[in-house]
């Protein structure tokens, strides 16, 4: 049985060296809300020896034009590069686990000879705040 989950996606990239961390974070949130599959940054050396950031956006082809507009509107870049890339993913599913603190979602990921389980951060953070515990204490107690 084949476990391969690979698809071709578009990757949009741009360089920025004159945005604050807050501005870049806001841009990333806005890009995700506009339909990006993934948004991440890579630290890079820019021209004139400036530290900068490469903003990377993975998307479906039909979202590309919209996302380019969102990138230009929310960053200081003057150019966006486009690449085709292969994206390999594990199969994902969720299950609800009953705990002494209420229901918690658990993400199950598998494929390529790997199986993983991970509790959802938002649920753990909620319990930690409600119970006055650290995230590590919550993980250990459930």
Regions from the PLM with identified roles:
Residues 3-8:
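Short, small-residue-biased leader/transition segments that mark boundaries at the very start
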Residues 18-58, 62-79, 84-142:
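Long, contiguous binding/interaction regions
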Residues 9-11, 54:
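Intrinsic-disorder/low-complexity, polar/charged segments enriched in Ser/Thr/Lys/Arg/Asp/Glu/Gln
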Residues 11-19:
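Glycine-rich phosphate/diphosphate-binding loops and the adjacent beta-loop-alpha structural elements
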């Amino acid at each position: 049985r084949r476990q391969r989950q690979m698809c071709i996606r578009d990757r949009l990239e741009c360089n920025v060296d004159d945005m604050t961390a807050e501005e870049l974070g806001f841009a990333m949130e806005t890009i995700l809300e506009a339909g990006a599959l993934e948004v991440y940054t890579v630290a890079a050396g820019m021209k004139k020896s400036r530290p900068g950031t490469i903003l990377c956006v993975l998307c479906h082809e039909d979202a590309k034009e919209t996302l380019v507009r969102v990138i230009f509107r929310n960053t200081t870049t003057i150019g966006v590069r486009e690449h085709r890339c292969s994206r390999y993913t594990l199969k994902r599913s969720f299950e609800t686990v009953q705990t002494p603190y209420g229901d918690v979602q658990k993400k199950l990921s598998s494929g390529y000879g790997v199986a993983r389980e991970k509790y959802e951060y938002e649920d753990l953070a909620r319990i930690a705040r409600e119970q006055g515990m650290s995230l590590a204490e919550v993980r250990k107690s459930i």
